[in-house]
Each structure stands twice: as structure tokens, then as C-alpha cells.
Amino acid sequence: RRLTPVLLMVIGAGGSLAMTVIGKQVIDRARPARALAVPPYETSPSFPSGHTLNTWVIVMLIGYLVCLRLHGLRGRVAVVGVAVVFGLAMAASRVYLGHHWLTDVLVALTLGSAWLIVVVTGHRLALTVKRRQHEASSSS
């Protein structure tokens, strides 16, 4: 049980990192002109925004794991709200600083959200299977 949060974070972060690396290699999109950017300058391809994709996945997974421990709706809404604001602030900063095009961060948020759906659904499915196995063994 204690390994589950670590495993979720490793799977989530590993998947988002893989999407970032593969996306940058396949698309190989140039970044905005350096005259538009704030130093230090990035040298890797622009698409997708790795900062946005990885931050979104990690922060939202942390929010999900914290929400699993909370019982009240107010606390859960606050946790999710903070996670969303932090993730969107990262996305906005990448465009504002001139390191990415808007589409780089929008696609990163979309890819990250899709990956979160897969990871969280897998976790919920595993919890359901475990609960049903426990109920079946208890009723026998």
C-alpha cells in the first residue's frame, strides 16, 4: 500500500517524460526567436513543452493522491484548485518568457491530461479489483 503512491508517480512521470522526448524528436519544432525570449535560452526542440507536460502530470497526480486522503469536499476542491493554478501558471510562463509557442503548451496540457486519465483510471481499476477480491474472500 505504501508503494502505490511512489509507483503512480514513477509511472506518471515516466510516461510524461517519454512523451516529451519522443515528441521533441519526432516533431523537431524550432523555438520562438531568441530576441523574444528571456535568458537562459533553451536549446532543445520546442514541441511539446516538457516543463508544462511534466509539471502538469506530476502536480495533478500529487493532487489526486492528496485527495484520496481527504474526506471533505472543500479540502479536495482546494487541493485540485491549487494544482490546476500551479500547472497553468507553468504553462503560461513558458509562453510569456518566450521559450514556447502557445500550441506547444496547449498540446502539452492535452497530452498530460490524457496520460493522467490513463494513469488514474488504471489506479481506480486496480483499487476496484482489489476491493472485490477482498469482498469475495470475506464472504467465503
Question: Predicted regions span which residues?
Answer:
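Hydrophobic alpha-helical bundle signature of multipass membrane enzymes
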Residues: 1-42, 62-68, 81
